[in-house]
Amino acid sequence: LFWHYLEKSELRPVVREEYKEPCSSLYVRDKKTLLFEVTYYKKRINFEVFHALTDGTGATEFLRELVKNYLYLIHEEDLEPVELSNQYLTVKDQEDDSFSRYYDPDFPRKKKKKIRAVQIKKGGKGYEELQINEASMSVKELLGIAREKKVSMSVLLTAAFICAIHEEMSRMQEKKPVILMVPVNLRKIFPSDSMLNFFGYIEPGYQFGGGKDSFEDVLEAVKLYFQENLSKEHMAGRMNELIAIEKHKILKWAPLELKNRCIRAGAKMAEQEVTAVLSNMSVVKMPEDYAQYIEKFGVYTSTNRTELCICSFKDTLSLSFTSRYDSTNIQRNFYRILTELGVQVTVTEADFPEDAKANYEGKKVLQIFTFCCIAAIVLSMMTDIIISPGVHWSVYVASGCATMWFTMAVGYVKRFNLLKNAAWQLLIMSGICVLWDLGTGWRGWSVNIGIPNICLLIQIVMLIISRIRSLSPREYMIYYV
């Protein structure tokens, strides 16, 4: 009612072959599912996780343990069991809420002026499916060039990404800066062994159109930004600013539905302050005996904009672009910039099962039904006007279509929890009965006949659902009440 929460689940994870598009939804409202999934495809092991459980560091640690145990089972004769993490770590350490531990309500807050960033224009109709573009390069090559220019690899890649975006901008778009969101692992700044979310972010960017638009100019500006904003004091300020909202005594007890709407509105506004995202997962390390069986690690995230994720294993730096746009020009520009710097970039074809596509059939059925309802209302009104202009029988047709559409729409939205769906249908159909009774001249049939019969029908439906799905009293009693 007031906040989201995680609860223990008796569901057992099932490892299966990859069967849907990467980064598909794991959290489905009203449906009891695990918030992570392990699948495989050919020689690749996939670990997908919902961000509420952990961040990139926690996900990487889990994947390392998963791969280690898999390799040990396969090559038990050649491998020795090893500990990847600190043997003295406890579950309490790993479940520590480090945000709360380092939160300081008295930390001085600095007001930051909000700047609208340039937004990447869609080159046509945006894809609903996640577009993935992968490449790899030598860590030594890239690191050598970064050292020549006296910057870190993160700074070099950030500058290249900003310039790649700029090449697709018009003169009008240059009025706004290109701003990237770059997540920061706070464990490197504030000591923590937590596997829960513990990250912040910085927003390096560049204002083009001022005459100094070369790669070297951008690189110098990004280098300076990183130096100024990756300090402990600056990251603490950002962290405290965000946690203060969660800790607010009044907001804490605001209804969840109101919070969700405010969060969505805030997220929509925040989107205007960022052009794209660059996430550097840093180095993934494995014991030498195990590393010989591993080719590379890779990472990518679901996104509504363009995002670049980076991680390295041995001498291979893996780059993964994800977006829902139909253009790959930015990716092409990025690879070309790195090639011109002297880095050999190998673009790899994303390899996924052919049938691993998102399923939008239910959504399409609802869209077709919506169109049919609107068409029926329009046709009835036209017929009414032409044939019998003084009768207005089309009002009843429109009301009937609206009733059917609303009932089906709620049924579609609540389809993952049949008991909750039934409870909603009880309220909706009862309300519709009363409205129809009022609209046709109150006779009381809705209260005397309609609602009692609907209640009886819903009770029977709930009983059947509970029996078929073998639900425990804890799961269905609340709906009976």
Label each residue range with its predicted role.
Residues I132, F199-M281:
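Helical lid/core segments from catalytic subdomains that handle acyl or acyl-like groups
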Residues S380-S399, K414-L419, L435-I454, S472-E475, ...:
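Membrane-helix interface and helix-disruption motif detector
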Residues F2-E18, T33-L35, G123-E134, F190-F226, ...:
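Acyl/amide activation-and-transfer machinery of modular secondary-metabolite enzymes
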Residues P353-G400:
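N-terminal topogenic module of multi-pass integral membrane proteins
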Residues L1-V14, V82-M137:
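Short amphipathic alpha-helices and their capping loops
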Residues L1-T90, L143-R147, S152-E174, M281-V284, ...:
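Non-catalytic N-terminal regions of enzymes
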Residues F406-M408, L456-I478:
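Alpha-helical transmembrane segments in multipass membrane proteins, preferentially the mid-helix core
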Residues I374-I385, W405-A409, L427-R443, V461-I464:
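Hydrophobic alpha-helical transmembrane segments and adjacent interfacial helices
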